[in-house]
């Protein structure tokens, strides 16, 4: 069957990351990426290294890392002045022109493509209810299409199905079974599903079909599909999926996020892209400076809407949505359904239909074994080491360690490396190219231990993480569920180990509720804590956070944590 084929072969090439210029920067600024001259690509005695021409004159190499003093960014530190920085929040969008939309004069567009397969149509309401119950699918709203049980029943055109089948998936995930017919029908959709449920493909494939039914982009046109995401990591992850499945249609995309130079992103937007995946701050920056516009957007996705609101992006999201025609199709995806997300949906989605996988109550993935140990603060490192010794007996294991602050993340990484463990850390003060490198080392298993702050608790999609270790308990149970959701994905089992102190006592009751719902064993000392209110105030460890401002040469950035030499007694 066909969905209209405006695109055919008439689309330019250059799809994917950066359209021809994905380098990390040139010349003195980054010393050709990772800086030549040192073993393992580290700065090794001169050159600008990452620090942007600040020196890097370290002494001899130790285990391939530059020794004494210089290290990765020399005395200036990795951040070289401001750290990686996220999207700028202050006054964003102040110069955006208010749009007055007259739907009578706007060009019409097609958004309804779903034609129910005869096999699906023949299923009784009883069969449909049984399928939904088996797969924990709950739906709300009028005239919701029946779920599909196979890829072929979804009725995607051949150019999409070829790519899907090449991935070797046996059948659609529950969110895809119900979400594809909903999204293809052109309706506004709210999807509530845990991380790792397959939601990215649930909106990506209908987006590709949508694009192929629209007129070709003209010079100066902005994107047709806009995907908003909370973090750079998630944005890049989404881009990889769209690149993979949009390849045969020659759909062009770009990823627009802060913390990296704008040049490549601006060039992509100027050439014309059908899909723009963006974090809110950098996108507003691009619109305000006239580098793109959202007049052609007819398919909008808000991914991890709850996380975007948690991170304070609501004013930016509302400004962006005001730049998009109101008769667009909007798909909103979220792991949870708090009142803030409900308010956003009711303000910006029209007559939406909703699909929910699992309970709307705060609940953890039941494939994850949750172990919570009540410890004192000074016991933590010893406990962590003992767990690592056991976990890393299996060389295929990958462990993600969460800390409450950037300082603790760097301290722990340095401690582990000096103890011989191949650990690297990632957090908001690391420059983007360091974060990319660390993530790649972790993904490929070269460094199977990654220490992270909550910047990585959502939006980093690394397959086969076998263990999550909460060195510090997060501020609330919702973040706890998001953190441990990095393991046990795509039908796999996982293990989450959490160190819980009296400082976290305020969170004990919520945590016990999560553990009870998932039928987990509860430490008697944790159960005891729930009898008392008050307690340590739930501040988490480390108080004020660390490192905002000037960068810290040799103190907590690449030169002293990720580039710390591995101790002599290698542990792995």
From Swiss-Prot:
Residues 180-355 form the Helicase ATP-binding domain. It is found in: Cytoplasm; Nucleus. Its EC number is 3.6.4.13. A motif (DEAD box) lies at residues 303-306. A motif (Q motif) lies at residues 149-177. Keywords: ATP-binding, Cytoplasm, Helicase, Hydrolase, Nonsense-mediated mRNA decay, Nucleotide-binding, Nucleus, Ribosome biogenesis, RNA-binding, rRNA processing. It catalyses: ATP + H2O = ADP + phosphate + H(+). Residues 383-530 form the Helicase C-terminal domain. GO terms for cellular component: cytoplasm; nucleus; ribonucleoprotein complex. GO terms for biological process: alternative mRNA splicing, via spliceosome; nuclear-transcribed mRNA catabolic process, nonsense-mediated decay; rRNA processing. Residues 547-557 have a biased composition (Gly residues). ATP-dependent RNA helicase involved nonsense-mediated mRNA decay and ribosome biogenesis through rRNA processing. Associates with polysomes. PANTHER family: ATP-DEPENDENT RNA HELICASE DBP3. This is ATP-dependent RNA helicase dbp2. It comes from Sclerotinia sclerotiorum (strain ATCC 18683 / 1980 / Ss-1) (White mold).
């Amino acid at each position: 069957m066909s969905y209209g084929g405006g695109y055919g072969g008439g689309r330019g090439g250059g799809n994917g990351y950066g359209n021809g210029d994905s380098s990390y920067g040139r010349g003195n600024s980054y010393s050709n990426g990772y800086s030549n001259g040192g073993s393992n690509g580290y700065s090794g005695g001169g050159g600008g290294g990452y620090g942007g021409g600040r020196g890097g004159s370290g002494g001899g190499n130790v285990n391939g890392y530059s020794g004494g003093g210089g290290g990765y960014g020399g005395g200036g530190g990795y951040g070289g002045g401001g750290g990686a920085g996220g999207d700028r929040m202050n006054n964003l969008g102040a110069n955006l022109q208010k749009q007055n939309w007259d739907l009578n004069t706007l060009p019409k567009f097609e958004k309804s493509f779903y034609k129910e397969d005869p096999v699906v149509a023949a299923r009784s309401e009883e069969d449909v209810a049984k399928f939904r119950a088996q797969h924990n699918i709950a739906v709300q709203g009028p005239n919701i299409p029946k779920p599909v049980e196979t890829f072929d029943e979804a009725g995607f055109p051949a150019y999409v199905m070829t790519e899907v089948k090449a991935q070797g998936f046996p059948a659609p995930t529950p969110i895809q079974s119900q979400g594809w017919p909903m999204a293809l029908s052109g309706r506004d959709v709210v999807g509530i599903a845990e991380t790792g449920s397959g939601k990215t493909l649930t909106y990506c494939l209908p987006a590709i079909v949508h694009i192929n039914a629209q007129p070709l982009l003209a010079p100066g046109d902005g994107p047709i599909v806009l995907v908003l995401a909370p973090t750079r990591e998630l944005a890049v992850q989404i881009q990889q999926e769209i690149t993979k499945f949009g390849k045969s249609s020659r759909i062009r995309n770009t990823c627009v996020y802060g913390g990296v130079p704008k040049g490549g992103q601006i060039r992509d937007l100027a050439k014309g892209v059908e899909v723009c995946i963006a974090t809110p701050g950098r996108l507003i920056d691009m619109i305000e400076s006239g580098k793109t516009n959202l007049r052609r957007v007819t398919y909008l996705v808000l991914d991890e809407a709850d996380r975007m609101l948690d991170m304070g992006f609501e004013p930016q999201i509302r400004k962006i949505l005001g730049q998009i025609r109101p008769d667009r199709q909007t798909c909103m995806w979220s792991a949870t359904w708090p009142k803030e997300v409900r308010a956003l949906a009711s303000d910006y989605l029209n007559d939406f239909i909703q699909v929910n996988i699992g309970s709307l109550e705060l609940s953890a993935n039941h494939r994850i074994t949750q172990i919570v140990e009540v410890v004192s603060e000074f016991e933590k490192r010893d406990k962590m080491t003992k767990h690592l010794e056991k976990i890393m007996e299996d060389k295929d294991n990958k462990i993600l360690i969460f800390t409450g602050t950037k300082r603790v993340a760097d301290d722990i990484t340095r401690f582990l490396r000096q103890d011989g463990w191949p650990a690297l850390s990632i957090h908001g003060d690391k420059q983007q190219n360091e974060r990319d490198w660390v993530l790649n080392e972790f993904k490929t298993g070269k460094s199977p231990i990654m220490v992270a702050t909550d910047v990585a608790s959502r939006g980093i999609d690394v397959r086969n993480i076998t263990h999550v270790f909460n060195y510090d308990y997060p501020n609330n149970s919702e973040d706890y569920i998001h953190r441990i959701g990095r393991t046990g994905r795509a039908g796999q089992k996982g293990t989450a180990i959490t160190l819980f102190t009296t400082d976290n006592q305020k969170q004990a009751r919520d945590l016990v509720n999560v553990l009870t719902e998932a039928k987990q064993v509860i430490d008697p000392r944790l159960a005891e804590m729930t009898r008392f209110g008050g307690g340590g105030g739930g501040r988490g460890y480390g108080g004020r956070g660390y490192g905002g401002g000037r960068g810290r040469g040799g103190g907590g950035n690449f030169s002293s944590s990720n580039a710390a030499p591995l101790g002599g007694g290698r542990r792995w």
